[in-house]
Amino acid sequence: MITSEDIRERGVPDFKPGDTIRVEYRVVEGNRERTQAFEGLCIARRGSGISQTFVVRKNSFGVDVERIFPLHSPKIAGIKVISRGAPRRAKLYYIREKVGRKARVKKAR
C-alpha cells in the first residue's frame, strides 16, 4: 500500500501539459529488469492524489505514440523535465491532428 509519506519521498518534479518530459520506467522481461526511457510532450494530466495520471506523446520513426502513466507508480524510476512549454490549454488533445511544425507548443519564457 502506498501512503502519503511515500508520495512525498518520491520527489515527483512539477510539470504541466506542454512540457517536454523524459519518463524512465522499469520493464520486466522474463527474469531481468531494465529501465526504458520515454521522452515526449505531456499533453494531459488528470486525477488527484494517488490516482493521478499523465499522458505523454512522442513521434517514433514517423509513428506518433501516446502512453498513459500513473504518476505514483512504483514502475516509474524517474521523471525529468527537459523543457517547459507555454500552452493556453490544460489538455492538448488538439496536437493529435497536427503534423510537423504545427504540432509544436510555444516555449515558456
UniProtKB/Swiss-Prot annotation:
One example of a Gene Ontology biological process annotation: translation
InterPro entries hit by this protein: Ribosomal_bL19 (IPR001857), Ribosomal_bL19_sf (IPR038657), Translation_prot_SH3-like_sf (IPR008991)
Domain of life: Bacteria
SUPFAM superfamilies attached to this UniProt entry: Translation proteins SH3-like domain (SSF50104)
A Gene Ontology cellular-component term: cytosolic large ribosomal subunit
Transmembrane feature ranges: none
Pfam families, per the entry: Ribosomal_L19
Gene Ontology molecular-function annotations: structural constituent of ribosome
Keywords: Ribonucleoprotein, Ribosomal protein
Family as reported in the entry's similarity comment: Belongs to the bacterial ribosomal protein bL19 family.
Described purpose of this protein according to its UniProt entry: This protein is located at the 30S-50S ribosomal subunit interface and may play a role in the structure and function of the aminoacyl-tRNA binding site.
Protein name, per record: Large ribosomal subunit protein bL19
Name of the encoding gene: rplS
